[in-house]
């Protein structure tokens, strides 16, 4: 009886809150609605997030007052859109500020909202304000109807007399009321990126975060999936897929409350990052990008892929360059003659470009290994007496483009740069210094360091305007966390350092908009959509073993289109055939890092044919819709297919991962084809030496 009375009271209270003054804000895609409402208390609440409502009047069926629990303090509180610390809520807030008088509370009230058309969608801007302190928060939501993607971020500003201290600053908050929640996360390590694992979320908090600073995603990636009511499945069920556009420390909080509702709170990790915000200074959070798919993760991935190509990825609609890299051919040991021969091999292979990797720079402390030279970006004259201009000319003579590797955010203590500017490195005073890969991270919170890092690209391009590509690496997390530049504001280092990186990348893009760049971080430890505004692609992993790459590429494909993912044919796992290695790399942006002279005539011919076919099929693989058909996590096989936008062409990749005992192979049913068309099926990649 008590339960029945409580339910009746809920119904009466909900009808009461549907007063005319309870302004409703609807943020819509073609498939999803996010509905917000101003409560009777003047604060803003989420009332609905789910499948798009069919009728406008359906909005009247939702109320801000959700009766979150039996405890009186929260029984009339709803799902506050940007909850502040110190209010009547018992759960994790989105924002925490310590004001000039020491008060640690922030309560935000609705002020106004507006909407405007932007490229590809509609932006809704909502203004909130604390009624006791001069603090304003602006919430931004950009809805992309066709792609079913919503991008959201927040801006914080105040007009107090002195700086306030920000200790929490989430990008947004989302709420769900389902019977169960199943989280898929993506763990990582060197050569072990994007490993998927799932668990059911129970009462309490699950936190995914990183504290590594620059190479931030080395152990976990900034994206996740949440299955609603059931575990995440490929082709059916409701799934939230979210990713944060931030190259630095991030944090995802998943909090299941006392009545089984889920709060999802993405943002910068506030670890060691109490941020002193000056009056009238705007603190902008990273963008959180999400899609809510009712047709499984496969549809959610296609949503994100299309959105990325259209609106986020640099040159998202352009073609990509196939290449030959010298790293596994030569390591640090090369000269001008060796590189010139490799350029000729690149042309013979049929790729578009030769990419020169690490080891081309530094004179006083030559880059003979990874112990010296980082920071000194003048060409090593013993190795390359003609400098970069001679290499660009040699590439042009070979009829291939020329690209080059840089790692401008780093410095070796054994370098001229460190001798001149030791205060430019992030390094603790009065402590033993810890080196990761024999190097330190430059302090990009310092504007002078930003100028220097930008000059690395500028100097190369001024001398060699025909350089066609940069591979931008970052091999170290931040160690010895201390900024000589920030002095007594060390809580800002993790954030201002990342903002400094973005400042440099913006300058590079503004001045060299047509130069493609690969984002690399000791493999795939950098893979976010803010960085990919400035990079055409990213290096998924140093692990190019085709068996392991199947899993790595499967994981990254959940959030990134194939044209953003680099995959190279190398000598890793020589027990597998060259064909197998080439086929796996062909699922993404194809490249080679292998000695062509090591190949047999048949293997070389196969690679040449594969390059030609990949170029011919690039519009389907790079720009088509991807359908993941058979998961390597569920057995000994893997299959996926791409379908061109006009559905006239499709490409199927299917693998027997560990062939044993002539095991039975199962038929694969393709997806995405037009049932009203007839297709001719051709086996493109054949080889007598095939082992899959």
Describe each model-derived feature in a short phrase.
Residues 1-7, 11, 685-692:
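Single conserved hydrophobic/aromatic residue that forms the stacking wall/gate
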Residues 317-394, 398-455:
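Aromatic-lined carbohydrate-binding/catalytic grooves of carbohydrate-active enzymes
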Residues 31, 154, 280, 395, ...:
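Conserved, mostly hydrophobic/aromatic
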Residues 430-569, 598:
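Active-site neighborhood of glycoside hydrolase catalytic domains
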Residues 106-107, 275-294:
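Short Pro-Gly-centered flexible turn/kink motifs
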Residues 16-28, 32-35, 44-255, 271, ...:
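Polysaccharide-binding surfaces and accessory modules of carbohydrate-active proteins
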Residues 583-626:
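Catalytic cores of secreted or luminal carbohydrate-active enzymes
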Residues 31, 224-226, 234, 631-674:
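Carbohydrate-binding surface patches
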């Amino acid at each position: 009886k008590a339960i029945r009375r409580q339910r009746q009271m809920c119904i009466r209270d909900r009808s009461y809150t549907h007063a005319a003054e309870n302004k409703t804000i609807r943020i819509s895609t073609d498939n999803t609605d996010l509905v917000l409402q101003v409560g009777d208390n003047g604060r803003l609440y989420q009332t609905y997030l789910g499948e798009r409502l069919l009728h406008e009047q359906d909005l009247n069926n939702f109320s801000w007052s959700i009766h979150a629990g039996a405890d009186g303090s929260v029984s009339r509180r709803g799902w506050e859109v940007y909850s502040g610390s110190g209010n009547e809520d018992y759960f994790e807030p989105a924002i925490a500020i310590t004001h000039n008088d020491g008060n640690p509370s922030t309560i935000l009230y609705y002020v106004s909202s507006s909407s405007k058309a932007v490229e590809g969608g509609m932006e809704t801007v909502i203004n909130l304000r604390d009624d006791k302190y001069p603090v304003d928060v602006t919430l931004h939501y950009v809805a992309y109807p066709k792609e079913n993607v919503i991008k959201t971020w927040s801006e914080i500003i105040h007009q107090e007399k002195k700086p306030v201290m920000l200790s929490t600053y989430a990008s947004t908050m989302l709420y769900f009321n389902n019977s169960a929640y199943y989280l898929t996360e993506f763990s990582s390590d060197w050569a072990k990126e994007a490993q998927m694992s799932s668990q059911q979320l129970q009462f309490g908090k699950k936190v995914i975060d990183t504290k590594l600073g620059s190479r931030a995603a080395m152990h976990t990636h900034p994206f996740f999936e949440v299955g609603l009511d059931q575990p995440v499945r490929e082709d059916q069920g409701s799934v939230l897929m979210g990713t944060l556009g931030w190259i630095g420390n991030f944090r995802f909080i998943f909090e299941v409350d006392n009545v089984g509702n889920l709060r999802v709170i993405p943002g910068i990790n506030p670890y060691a990052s109490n941020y002193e915000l000056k009056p009238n200074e705007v603190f902008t959070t990273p963008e959180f990008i999400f899609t809510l798919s009712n047709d499984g993760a496969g549809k959610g991935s296609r949503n994100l892929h299309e959105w990325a190509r259209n609106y986020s990825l640099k040159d998202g609609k352009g073609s990509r360059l196939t290449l030959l890299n010298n790293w596994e051919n030569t390591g640090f040991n090369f000269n001008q003659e060796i590189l010139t021969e490799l350029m000729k091999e690149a042309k013979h292979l049929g790729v578009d470009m030769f990419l020169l990797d690490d080891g081309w720079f530094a004179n006083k402390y030559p880059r003979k290994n990874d112990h010296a030279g980082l920071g000194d970006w003048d060409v090593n004259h013993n190795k390359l007496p003609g400098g970069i201009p001679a290499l660009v000319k040699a590439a042009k003579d070979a009829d291939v483009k020329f690209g080059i590797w840089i790692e401008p955010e780093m410095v070796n203590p054994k370098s001229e740069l460190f001798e001149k500017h030791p205060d430019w490195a992030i390094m603790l005073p009065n402590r033993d210094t810890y080196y990761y890969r024999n190097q330190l991270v430059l302090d990009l919170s310092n504007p002078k360091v930003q100028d220097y890092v930008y000059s690395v690209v500028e100097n190369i391009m001024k001398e060699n305007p025909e350089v066609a590509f940069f591979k931008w690496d970052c091999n170290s997390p931040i160690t010895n966390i201390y900024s000589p530049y920030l002095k007594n504001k060390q809580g800002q280092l993790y954030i201002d350092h990342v903002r400094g990186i973005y400042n440099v990348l913006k300058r590079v893009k503004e001045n060299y908009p047509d130069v493609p760049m690969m984002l690399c971080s000791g493999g795939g430890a950098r893979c976010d959509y803010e960085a990919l505004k400035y990079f055409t692609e990213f290096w998924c992993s140093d692990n190019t073993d085709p068996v392991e790459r199947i899993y790595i590429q499967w994981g990254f494909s959940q959030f990134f289109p194939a044209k953003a993912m680099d995959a190279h044919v190398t000598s890793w796992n020589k027990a597998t055939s060259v064909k197998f290695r080439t086929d796996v790399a062909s699922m993404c942006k194809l490249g080679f890092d292998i000695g062509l002279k090591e190949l047999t005539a048949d293997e070389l011919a196969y690679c040449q044919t594969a390059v030609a076919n990949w170029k011919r099929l690039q519009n389907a693989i790079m720009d088509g819709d991807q359908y993941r058909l058979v998961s390597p996590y569920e057995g000994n096989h893997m299959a996926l297919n791409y379908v061109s936008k006009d559905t006239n062409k499709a490409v199927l990749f299917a693998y027997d991962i560990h062939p044993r005992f002539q095991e039975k192979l199962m038929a694969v049913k393709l997806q995405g084809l037009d049932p009203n068309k007839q297709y001719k099926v051709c086996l493109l990649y054949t080889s007598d030496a095939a082992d899959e």
